[in-house]
Swiss-Prot record:
Forms part of the ribosomal stalk which helps the ribosome interact with GTP-bound translation factors. Is thus essential for accurate translation. The lineage of its organism: Bacteria, Bacillati, Actinomycetota, Actinomycetes, Frankiales. It comes from the Bacteria. GO terms for biological process: translation. It comes from Frankia alni (strain DSM 45986 / CECT 9034 / ACN14a). The gene is rplL. This is Large ribosomal subunit protein bL12. HAMAP family: Ribosomal_bL12.
Amino acid sequence: MAKLSTEELLDAFKELTLLELSEFVKQFEETFGVTAAAPVAVAAAPAAGGAGGEAPAAEEQDEFDVILESVGDKKIQVIKEVRALTSLGLKEAKDLVDGAPKPVLEKVAKEAADKAKAALEGAGASVTVK
């Protein structure tokens, strides 16, 4: 097989449907043992034993998890919101909603967590942000 350039790959992806792309991503993840989750910057932890009192005693939390506690009676609307927030497929979003309580988003900024909480609550779900 000839080596494809990045541009040729992008052109090929543009011709695929979302369902085909979703299947491709799953196969890619399985083949290479990776996930398509967005990378999150990790702050370096201070050395054990401490080098003095440089770190504040209580740091403000900057990463939040959005937990779907319960669905309510508008299950279809909640599934639609979960799909919009996570770009999961229909089956995966339904499984997540059916398995509540479960995290919908993990390690996101406060603004994104609040926006997701508002969207899910607007669809009728009960949500907590941790």
